[in-house]
């Protein structure tokens, strides 16, 4: 679980669970062998914007530069195909169903999960993903928490966003230890558009706060 940073939330947590016995960060858990060591790759996205884009709302910017950005989506698709050349279990996290469908249609041997799926559908999709070689699972924010798939070898954050908690919770999906992997590879994108560039910088700060290895 992601421990809250604000004092009141931490006190509420302590009141329910008891006093802190030992404070261990992600780096410590990695060093002690409880989490898989990650390598984070920040992939720059070419600036295709115009002056007029500064007048767009955040929702409009997100749709243009993330959901429907053909150049960016092609980068994600080609990245997945390249990884699939070797044994792998790839998790791609997106924000909305439309983005999930775009990637699902273009990436071979991919599976898709969304919030409206009932429990039986989720379980079957996850099992199919686990049992298939060189497979890709594309999920909306449902994949951020509550899903335990330790076999994940590669995580692609295709959704952007700036929230530290959301970023670290997504990261946690891939750090589970499993006999099939010695390392896990994380891919994130440095978008150059209004709102999105600032959000990318915030995510990098979140990774750096854990002392993780980052390639920019």
Describe each region flagged by the PLM:
Residues 89-93, 98-102, 108-147, 166:
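Conserved helicase ATPase core of P-loop NTP-dependent helicases/translocases
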Residues 4-10, 24, 50-52, 146-149, ...:
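Switch/connector loops and helix/strand junctions flanking conserved nucleotide-binding motifs
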Residues 1-41, 207:
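Post-DEXD/H (motif II) to motif III coupling segment of the RecA-like Helicase ATP-binding lobe
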Residues 32, 36-56, 206-213:
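Conserved P-loop NTPase
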Residues 178-216:
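C-terminal helicase lobe
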Residues 50-106:
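Conserved interdomain hinge at the start of the Helicase C-terminal
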Residues 138-139, 144-161, 166-169, 183-189:
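A short beta-strand element within the Helicase C-terminal
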Residues 2-3, 162-186, 203-204:
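Conserved SF2 helicase motif VI
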């Amino acid at each position: 679980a992601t421990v809250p940073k604000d004092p009141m939330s931490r006190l509420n947590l302590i009141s329910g669970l008891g006093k802190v016995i030992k404070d261990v960060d992600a780096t410590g858990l990695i060093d002690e062998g409880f989490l898989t060591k990650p390598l984070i790759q920040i992939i720059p996205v070419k600036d295709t914007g115009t002056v007029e884009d500064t007048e767009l709302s955040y929702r409009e910017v997100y749709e243009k530069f993330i959901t429907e950005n053909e150049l960016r989506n092609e980068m994600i698709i080609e990245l997945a195909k390249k990884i699939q050349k070797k044994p792998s279990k790839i998790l791609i996290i997106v924000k909305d169903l439309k983005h999930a469908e775009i990637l699902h249609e273009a990436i071979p041997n991919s599976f898709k999960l969304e919030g409206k799926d009932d429990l039986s559908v989720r379980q079957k999709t996850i099992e199919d993903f686990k049992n298939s070689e060189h497979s890709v699972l594309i999920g909306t924010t449902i994949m951020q928490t509550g899903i335990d798939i330790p076999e994940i070898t590669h995580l692609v954050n295709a959704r952007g966003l700036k929230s530290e908690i959301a970023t670290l919770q997504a990261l946690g999906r891939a750090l589970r230890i499993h006999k099939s992997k010695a390392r896990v590879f994380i891919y994130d994108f440095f978008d150059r558009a209004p709102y999105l560039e600032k959000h990318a910088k915030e995510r990098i700060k979140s990774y750096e706060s854990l002392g993780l290895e980052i390639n920019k």
